[in-house]
Structure formats: structure tokens, C-alpha cells
Swiss-Prot record:
The family this protein is said to belong to: Belongs to the GlpE family.
Gene name, Swiss-Prot/TrEMBL: glpE
PANTHER family (alphabetical): FAD-DEPENDENT OXIDOREDUCTASE, THIOSULFATE SULFURTRANSFERASE GLPE
Any GO MF annotation of the entry: thiosulfate-cyanide sulfurtransferase activity
Record protein name field: Thiosulfate sulfurtransferase GlpE
Keyword rRNA processing: no
Amino acid sequence: MSEFKRIPPEQALELRKQEGAVVVDIRDAQAFAAGHITGARHLDNHSVADFIRGANLDAPTLVVCYHGNSSQSAAAYLVGQGFSDVYSVDGGFELWRATYPAETAQGAAE
């Protein structure tokens, strides 16, 4: 079984450009609506099963939380579910927003 990798925002920005790459944001819905990485999908306990069922388990999957701590547990969980290319973004959305403010969006999850 593979393990997830911890990466800085700079590497996440590059990985995000790969075809099929997915960014999942595990923060609460209100925080997600207030701001998230452009193109990110909100993931919570209610949506994770549907996400896993429809996911390409081999696609780069980047997990983001507030500061890069909770995302590590979520990334490990996804690896345990069969995902093979999982990353936890160090510094979370807070560091991403500070580093790449133009690469953020607002609005509720679809």
C-alpha cells in the first residue's frame, strides 16, 4: 500500500495542473464557501462515499484543510480506500491563500 505525501503549496500548484488531478477541501461548509482553492471539491462525512465511488483512484488527489494537519488524516484515509496518488497540502488553505490569492474562489459547494 502506498502512503500519502506532504507537499508545499508550490508543488500543489503544479500537481493541480495535471490532467485528472482533484483537489478536495475538508474544511467546514462555511469556510469552504468563504474561500477555497479554485476548482476544489468540498468533502465531508456525508459526501465522501459518493466521492470515492466516482473517483479515479490513480488520479493525483490533493487534500486541503485549514493549516495542513487534519488533511493528513484524511489523506491517510483515502490511501486506505485504494487511492494511489494522494497528497496533503502543508499549511492548508491558509498558506495557499497567502501564497496564491489569485488561485482562490468563493461560493458554496456544488
